[in-house]
Amino acid sequence: MQALQSIIDNAFEQRAEITPDNVEPQVRDAINNVIAQLDSGKLRVAEKINGQWVTHQWLKKAVLLSFRISHNQVIDGSESRYFDKVPMKFANYDQARFEKEGFRVVPPAAVRQGAYIARNTVLMPSYVNIGAYVDEGSMVDTWATVGSCAQIGKNVHLSGGVGIGGVLEPLQANPTIIEDNCFIGARSEIVEGVIVEEGSVISMGVYIGQSTKIYDRETGEIHYGRVPAGSVVVSGNLPSKDGRYSLYCAVIVKKVDAKTRGKVGINELLRTID
């Protein structure tokens, strides 16, 4: 693995000069190897090690390099035709392989090669970009988008129209992460490498980036870039220092543990926020 990483790191330093026509075979093979392992889930761009999320920057570099080594080509789909550098993940799947891998894909859901989809996941008409990781038992609902290299945990529900930001455009240092057992409400956006920790509930229409104030109304604490575990979050506003105007923020209205979450439905958690 160290040799593979070295090839990727060195190639990334010369990325501006790499084209599909001049890329060295060793570099092409290394990039394709990484994309295949991301696709199968053997590698992932970020993982939790000793309780902390670690981003493997060299894998992100390989994803970026993959766009340098391929020409656009026609891609056939059931509803249309496409013209892109990245093949679709399911292009060569047959019924036996779908059954073996154990997830559902509802048309016209689109998943790029290099994204991993785990067992018991349901993809409604949605989009999952290259390098993303969607873990077991999760639901990616209609018109939701999982951005490049984003990490989605087990038993996560991404509601209709949710946007989970990627790392490629604009270029971000770390992927957006949604940990296990989270619920992200319809039309919410979580971007710029924000981490939503385990068991959190994000209400409909909440927008969180690195500069968004995440205000805990019980403690008065303000978080940036991280939603603490077990938070129930709604959209809100905080007044300016001079009191002349207010600016958008996300508000943690309560904290719940796994036991409470198991007994109380998501809708009930969001209704009782006064």
Swiss-Prot record:
Keywords: Acyltransferase, Amino-acid biosynthesis, Cytoplasm, Diaminopimelate biosynthesis, Lysine biosynthesis, Repeat, Transferase. GO terms for molecular function: 2,3,4,5-tetrahydropyridine-2,6-dicarboxylate N-succinyltransferase activity; nucleotidyltransferase activity. Pfam families: Hexapep_2, THDPS_N_2. GO terms for biological process: diaminopimelate biosynthetic process; lysine biosynthetic process via diaminopimelate. Gene3D superfamilies: Hexapeptide repeat proteins, Tetrahydrodipicolinate-N-succinyltransferase, N-terminal domain. Its EC number is 2.3.1.117. Pathway: Amino-acid biosynthesis; L-lysine biosynthesis via DAP pathway; LL-2,6-diaminopimelate from (S)-tetrahydrodipicolinate (succinylase route): step 1/3. Belongs to the transferase hexapeptide repeat family. This is 2,3,4,5-tetrahydropyridine-2,6-dicarboxylate N-succinyltransferase. NCBIfam families: dapD, PRK11830.1. GO terms for cellular component: cytoplasm.
